[in-house]
Regions:
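Bacterial extracytoplasmic/cell-wall-associated proteins, especially those involved in peptidoglycan
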Residues: 1-166
Protein backbone atom coordinates (compact mmCIF):
# COMPACT_ATOMS: atom_id res chain seq x y z
CA UNK A 1 0.00 0.00 0.00
CA UNK A 2 2.90 2.34 0.74
CA UNK A 3 4.35 1.78 -2.75
CA UNK A 4 1.02 2.69 -4.36
CA UNK A 5 0.72 5.81 -2.21
CA UNK A 6 4.24 6.83 -3.28
CA UNK A 7 3.34 6.26 -6.95
CA UNK A 8 0.20 8.37 -6.64
CA UNK A 9 2.10 11.15 -4.88
CA UNK A 10 4.84 11.13 -7.53
CA UNK A 11 2.25 11.20 -10.32
CA UNK A 12 0.48 14.18 -8.76
CA UNK A 13 3.76 16.12 -8.49
CA UNK A 14 4.65 15.35 -12.12
CA UNK A 15 1.13 16.12 -13.33
CA UNK A 16 1.20 19.48 -11.58
CA UNK A 17 4.59 20.38 -13.07
CA UNK A 18 3.35 19.37 -16.54
CA UNK A 19 0.23 21.52 -16.16
CA UNK A 20 -2.14 18.57 -16.20
CA UNK A 21 -3.98 19.12 -12.94
CA UNK A 22 -5.71 22.07 -14.55
CA UNK A 23 -7.97 21.32 -17.49
CA UNK A 24 -6.21 22.37 -20.69
CA UNK A 25 -8.20 23.04 -23.81
CA UNK A 26 -10.48 20.22 -24.87
CA UNK A 27 -9.23 17.69 -22.33
CA UNK A 28 -9.65 17.41 -18.58
CA UNK A 29 -6.94 16.07 -16.26
CA UNK A 30 -8.20 12.46 -16.43
CA UNK A 31 -8.24 12.52 -20.23
CA UNK A 32 -4.75 14.04 -20.40
CA UNK A 33 -3.47 11.36 -18.02
CA UNK A 34 -5.05 8.70 -20.26
CA UNK A 35 -3.46 10.24 -23.36
CA UNK A 36 -0.08 10.41 -21.59
CA UNK A 37 -0.33 6.75 -20.59
CA UNK A 38 -0.93 5.75 -24.23
CA UNK A 39 1.97 7.95 -25.36
CA UNK A 40 4.23 6.27 -22.78
CA UNK A 41 3.25 2.79 -24.00
CA UNK A 42 3.31 3.53 -27.73
CA UNK A 43 6.39 5.60 -28.37
CA UNK A 44 10.02 6.14 -27.65
CA UNK A 45 10.89 9.34 -25.80
CA UNK A 46 11.96 11.04 -29.04
CA UNK A 47 8.51 10.39 -30.56
CA UNK A 48 6.23 11.30 -27.63
CA UNK A 49 5.10 14.67 -29.04
CA UNK A 50 4.35 13.13 -32.45
CA UNK A 51 2.37 10.24 -30.91
CA UNK A 52 0.45 12.87 -28.95
CA UNK A 53 -0.37 14.65 -32.20
CA UNK A 54 -1.55 11.41 -33.86
CA UNK A 55 -3.90 10.78 -30.92
CA UNK A 56 -5.34 14.29 -31.12
CA UNK A 57 -5.66 14.20 -34.92
CA UNK A 58 -7.52 10.89 -34.79
CA UNK A 59 -9.85 12.15 -32.06
CA UNK A 60 -10.54 15.35 -34.01
CA UNK A 61 -11.34 13.35 -37.17
CA UNK A 62 -13.64 10.97 -35.28
CA UNK A 63 -11.38 8.03 -36.10
CA UNK A 64 -10.78 5.12 -33.74
CA UNK A 65 -7.40 5.47 -32.03
CA UNK A 66 -6.40 1.89 -32.95
CA UNK A 67 -3.57 1.82 -30.41
CA UNK A 68 -2.14 -1.66 -29.86
CA UNK A 69 -1.11 -0.78 -26.30
CA UNK A 70 -4.72 -0.31 -25.20
CA UNK A 71 -5.66 -3.79 -26.42
CA UNK A 72 -2.56 -5.28 -24.79
CA UNK A 73 -3.62 -3.56 -21.55
CA UNK A 74 -7.11 -5.07 -21.79
CA UNK A 75 -5.58 -8.51 -22.40
CA UNK A 76 -2.98 -8.05 -19.64
CA UNK A 77 -0.22 -8.48 -22.25
CA UNK A 78 1.69 -5.24 -21.67
CA UNK A 79 5.00 -5.07 -23.46
CA UNK A 80 3.93 -7.14 -26.46
CA UNK A 81 4.92 -5.96 -29.92
CA UNK A 82 2.61 -8.08 -32.06
CA UNK A 83 -1.17 -7.62 -32.09
CA UNK A 84 -3.25 -10.26 -33.84
CA UNK A 85 -6.33 -9.44 -35.89
CA UNK A 86 -8.29 -11.61 -33.43
CA UNK A 87 -7.14 -9.37 -30.56
CA UNK A 88 -8.65 -6.32 -32.25
CA UNK A 89 -12.08 -7.96 -31.94
CA UNK A 90 -11.88 -8.10 -28.13
CA UNK A 91 -14.99 -6.72 -26.44
CA UNK A 92 -13.47 -4.20 -24.04
CA UNK A 93 -13.85 -0.49 -23.33
CA UNK A 94 -10.06 -0.37 -23.72
CA UNK A 95 -10.13 -1.80 -27.25
CA UNK A 96 -9.51 1.34 -29.29
CA UNK A 97 -9.90 -0.65 -32.50
CA UNK A 98 -13.61 -1.15 -31.76
CA UNK A 99 -14.38 1.79 -29.46
CA UNK A 100 -14.13 5.39 -30.58
CA UNK A 101 -12.62 8.03 -28.33
CA UNK A 102 -10.33 7.58 -25.38
CA UNK A 103 -10.44 4.47 -23.20
CA UNK A 104 -12.14 4.96 -19.81
CA UNK A 105 -8.86 5.56 -17.98
CA UNK A 106 -5.07 5.36 -18.12
CA UNK A 107 -3.38 2.15 -19.25
CA UNK A 108 -0.28 2.77 -17.15
CA UNK A 109 1.60 5.31 -15.08
CA UNK A 110 3.18 7.81 -17.51
CA UNK A 111 6.41 9.65 -16.85
CA UNK A 112 6.92 13.40 -16.94
CA UNK A 113 7.92 13.55 -20.63
CA UNK A 114 4.76 11.70 -21.70
CA UNK A 115 2.69 14.05 -19.52
CA UNK A 116 4.34 17.07 -21.14
CA UNK A 117 3.74 15.61 -24.61
CA UNK A 118 0.05 15.07 -23.80
CA UNK A 119 -0.28 18.78 -23.03
CA UNK A 120 2.01 20.00 -25.84
CA UNK A 121 1.78 17.83 -28.97
CA UNK A 122 4.02 18.58 -31.92
CA UNK A 123 2.36 20.26 -34.89
CA UNK A 124 1.64 17.92 -37.80
CA UNK A 125 -1.05 16.24 -39.85
CA UNK A 126 -0.05 12.65 -39.03
CA UNK A 127 -2.76 10.10 -38.38
CA UNK A 128 -0.67 6.95 -38.73
CA UNK A 129 2.57 5.77 -37.21
CA UNK A 130 4.43 2.49 -37.06
CA UNK A 131 7.73 1.30 -35.68
CA UNK A 132 9.19 -0.61 -38.63
CA UNK A 133 12.39 -1.55 -36.77
CA UNK A 134 13.84 -0.78 -33.35
CA UNK A 135 14.42 3.00 -33.13
CA UNK A 136 12.74 3.57 -36.52
CA UNK A 137 9.24 4.94 -35.99
CA UNK A 138 7.60 6.65 -38.96
CA UNK A 139 4.68 9.08 -39.07
CA UNK A 140 2.41 9.90 -42.01
CA UNK A 141 -1.00 11.19 -43.03
CA UNK A 142 -1.09 8.74 -45.97
CA UNK A 143 -2.78 5.37 -45.51
CA UNK A 144 -0.93 4.09 -48.59
CA UNK A 145 2.47 5.02 -47.15
CA UNK A 146 1.48 3.46 -43.83
CA UNK A 147 0.58 0.25 -45.70
CA UNK A 148 4.03 0.09 -47.32
CA UNK A 149 5.65 0.57 -43.92
CA UNK A 150 3.43 -2.12 -42.40
CA UNK A 151 4.77 -4.64 -44.93
CA UNK A 152 8.31 -3.60 -43.91
CA UNK A 153 7.40 -3.99 -40.21
CA UNK A 154 6.01 -7.51 -40.78
CA UNK A 155 9.16 -8.50 -42.69
CA UNK A 156 11.33 -7.20 -39.85
CA UNK A 157 9.14 -8.95 -37.25
CA UNK A 158 9.55 -12.29 -39.08
CA UNK A 159 13.30 -11.66 -39.34
CA UNK A 160 13.49 -11.37 -35.54
CA UNK A 161 14.35 -7.67 -35.31
CA UNK A 162 11.85 -7.28 -32.47
CA UNK A 163 11.68 -9.22 -29.24
CA UNK A 164 8.06 -10.26 -29.49
CA UNK A 165 5.90 -12.23 -27.07
CA UNK A 166 3.70 -13.69 -29.80
Amino acid sequence: AEAIATMVERSQVEMKSAGILESTGKFNAQELLTIASIIQAEGGLQDFTKVSRVIRNRLEKGMPLQMDSTVHFAQKLRGNIFLSTKSTLLNSAYNTYRKYGLPPGPIGNPGKQALLAAVNPELGDWIYFITVAPNDTRFTSSFEEFGVWKVEYKKNLRAGLFESKE
